[in-house]
Regions:
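Structural beta-sheet core signal
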Residues: 17, 41-42, 142
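Short, well-ordered alpha-helical microsegments
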Residues: 4, 25-27, 127
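Conserved alpha/beta core of the MobA/IspD/sugar-nucleotide pyrophosphorylase nucleotidyltransferase superfamily
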Residues: 90-164
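Short beta-strand-to-loop acidic/aromatic patch adjacent to the donor-nucleotide binding site
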Residues: 13-23
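Short phosphate-binding loop-to-helix
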Residues: 1-14
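Short coil/turn segments at beta-strand junctions that form active-site/ligand-binding loops
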Residues: 13-14, 37, 138
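Conserved core of the sugar-phosphate nucleotidyltransferase
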Residues: 25-116
Length: 164
């Protein structure tokens, strides 16, 4: 969040905020940009784990406007809460690290950044900022994706990035 705060002066929207270590197919980003909602995130229903990997991930809980929503329907959701956690079964999916902001969404993010003390900014993660926005009453739309993205954490991951 500290690096996002450094870019505050140019954060006007519409824009994408994407983790620097994320590789994904272009259509994930295009779909985010085409969405008219003010705050939109891409979430994979499959939480990526490798073998016995129990490292925390950026996880989200969703609420859906359609009460018959199942993990297999394509309807987008609304972010209910988010956290960096290793309690995988308590969440509905993994945020891939891509956030689309409209002009209004960018203003909301800047407002949230302005409320945070410097010491909290330096320790806070983007997933925490998303949760803060939800707690402030902002609606964060979820677009579900199914694979075709990768967070590069190792040289092995980097070699897999070539497959995207």
């Amino acid at each position: 969040v500290a690096s996002l705060a450094c870019a505050r002066e140019v954060l006007r929207g519409p824009c994408l905020v994407v983790y620097g270590d994320v590789f994904c197919r272009r259509y994930h980003l295009q779909r985010l940009l085409l969405d008219e909602a003010d705050l939109v995130i891409a979430v994979d229903r499959q939480i990526s784990r490798h073998g016995d990997d129990t490292d925390p991930r950026d996880l989200v809980r969703a609420r859906h406007t359609n009460q018959t929503q199942t993990p297999f329907t394509e309807e987008d959701g609304i972010l209910a809460s988010s956290a960096n956690s290793d309690h995988f079964t308590d969440f509905d999916g993994e945020w891939i690290g891509a956030l689309k902001l409209s002009a209004k969404g960018a203003a909301w993010v800047c407002e949230s950044l302005d409320t945070l003390p410097a010491e909290k900014l330096s320790k806070m993660h983007l997933i925490d900022l998303l949760d803060l926005l939800v707690k402030a009453g902002r609606t964060v739309k979820i677009q579900y994706v199914s694979g075709d993205w990768l967070s590069v954490e190792s040289l092995v991951d980097l070699t897999h990035a070539g497959n995207l």
